[in-house]
């Protein structure tokens, strides 16, 4: 027979937990939920600060010329003239991504891009929630928290951009250096 000492359980309720600490899991859950509701185009806008912001929108107008691993002649012979329109560039690049998505370099770059993209948008959500809460509550060290969240957002944004740019270049490099398949 095992006896449960109820007095220990009652003492747990007396343990002083600050409301800020107790609400942290709720805030994290809300951030994850809100992040899941944000469409990927808006997340790209949060990271790149421009319209047509998905990584592939500048694949053939910018990135194709910015990486020495990319064989331009080979890529042109496989794909023909590069599209000028950002949406057309993204469509063509996305088809190449699907072709090479099993490559470990592409897979890892894609995973890191998505990780940093979501972390960036969640940080911005936390920043906005914190900003809104300052109108209702007096928050100790609010300026420090603002600066910390802003710094975190900027670092994550730069990391997201770097991962996205690397993903685009990796796909273009793989396509330009892979042997042409008959029927391609």
Where in the sequence are the language-model features?
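Juxtamembrane/interfacial segments around transmembrane helices
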Residues: 29, 70-82, 169-179
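Cytosolic/matrix-facing juxtamembrane and C-terminal tails of multi-pass cellular membrane proteins
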Residues: 154-184
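Charge-rich cytosolic interhelical loops and cytosolic tails of multi-pass membrane proteins
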Residues: 40-104
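Pore-lining and gate-forming transmembrane alpha-helices of multi-pass membrane transport proteins
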Residues: 23-24, 141-157, 161
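Transmembrane alpha-helical segments and their cytosolic interface motifs
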Residues: 98-144
